[in-house]
Structure formats: C-alpha cells, structure tokens
Regions:
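Flexible, solvent-exposed loop/hinge segments and secondary-structure transition points
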Residues: 1-143
C-alpha cells in the first residue's frame, strides 16, 4: 500500500486567505481555487466583482496544474508552439486549461500536493496572485 500526500482544508484556507489579502490590498477582484493532488476542488472563493465565468476557469486551472504537475501557462506555451504541434485534446478531459494562473504546489522533495489557481484578471496577474497562495502553503510545509 502507498501513501499519497495531498493538500487539505487548512492548506487551502491558508492559500485563499493570502490571495484574498493580496487582491484586497490592490483593490482587485478575482476567483481563487485550490485543488488537491487529484485535481478535486478543496476551496473556492469568488471575490465581489469577479466575473462569474472565472469560477469555471479557476477550477479548471487548478485541476490542470494539480493533475499535470506544471503551471498552466507552460501548457499554454506548448499549445501555441508550432514546433510541438501540441493539442489540448491530448489531455482527454475538457477541464484541461492552458491559460496562465494555475500553479502546482509541491512538497520539499518535488512531489505534487495540489494546486492554487486564480482567474478574473489578465493571465500574468492571475499567475502572480496564484504564486502568493502557493507560497503561503509551501512556506508552511514541514521540513
């Protein structure tokens, strides 16, 4: 039998709180999603003023980053690369997302624990705020 490490509700709350505070400090609104190692949603927050369509997008970004173990922007870069001729249908799941803003959360050994995603802002800003949530979790992991 094997044991799989994954994010939990406390981790998700830590990330959501950090992103919410950062967004508030800049007067911004977005949707924050945190997924476990399997890509299943642990927590979702839509701040007042964030687009409703960003709920699905943030959830899909979190699923993609968690299940693939890479930033969603990196997947998007592969999709746009003529050299790779990469297609999103490769993933076999309509939740696969190549827009920036989904980041995997890793333990100190590099194993994926889940993901944090933000949607509702331009791609690079989504990713910047997701990185704040990711750092809030990774900074609390045991050595």
């Amino acid at each position: 039998m094997r044991t799989i490490s994954t994010l939990d509700q406390d981790d998700a709350a830590r990330a959501v709180d950090a992103v919410k505070a950062a967004l508030a400090s800049e007067g911004r609104a977005a949707v924050v999603a945190v997924a476990d190692v399997h890509g299943d949603l642990l927590m979702l927050l839509r701040l007042d003023g964030a687009p409703a369509t960003s709920i699905t997008i943030a959830t899909n970004k979190a699923w993609t980053a968690a299940t693939q173990g890479v930033a969603t922007r990196a997947i998007g870069a592969r999709l746009r690369s003529e050299a790779e001729a990469f297609d999103i249908t490769y993933y076999g799941d309509r939740r696969a997302c190549g827009w920036g803003g989904g980041l995997p959360v890793m333990d100190r050994a590099g194993a994926v624990l889940g993901a944090v995603a933000v949607s509702g802002l331009p791609e690079l800003e989504d990713e910047r705020f997701a990185a704040i949530g990711k750092a809030a979790i990774e900074g609390s992991l045991e050595a």
